[in-house]
């Protein structure tokens, strides 16, 4: 029993060390690539100084780290077991009667623990930094002028024109299919952010690049209220733009997502993107376990077939396949062709089935 515990602890340490090294290398590489891309995008922007772009790359780093985590587990596991196989440590262990499942268990447990920490502790931090990054990106690189927020009090939307005049729109209720706003209030501000007028109306709807505001009253400073039947205000917004302007799922903490999903659905907006992201986070610990099994199927075949080429090609192909399959099923989930939960869990399920079946073939076949 003591020997088994010592061996399991040794496997866990080897796995953790190789994973840590691979993870750090991948994060550094992606950080440098992101920084170079930000420099390219900000080259013509006066506000985009190298220091600010470096800060933006650092803010994006936690989100990037989450994205590369499954691939770091995959390649870290392959390298760990490749070293153990090359040093004949696994050969001796198997000769002593240790099954593949026994020496994989410590690595699987560590991967599951990493997944839990990543989702429950690291994700809230990454979502905060990603939210700051997206605000800076919108302001500095995209110079966005439209802002939208959804809360218990309704929909709040701000739009501005080229002259700097701003309109803040509040709606108590929304019909998202035609984007009809009910119980609408519009506040008008000039370029100096001074309040100029206000409109209270029953409804407002988007139609051919205009807000069509019906059955309302316009209040202008030092003037009597003026009722109206219809007013048109030019806008660059579209229903799709408004839906996409909601807080990105990447900026929402794992703990905040369920409440925001409920708020979206109560307001009449689709919540597929956020529901998919929530399920992907739920599946993350199990996906990391699956990556350990998939990596083991290639690294353990070395001792039987004697080549590192198969391990490298198999690992790269597995990573590419995971990325490709995930993109396809996520797109199907977002388009409601398949249930969102099924789309989110499919990459994990396929990886688990593949890894388990291949290991069964190696061990018992």
Language-model regions, residue ranges each:
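Internal alpha-helical transmembrane segments
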Residues: 58, 62-163, 347
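Short, aromatic-rich amphipathic segments at membrane interfaces
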Residues: 53, 57-59, 261-281
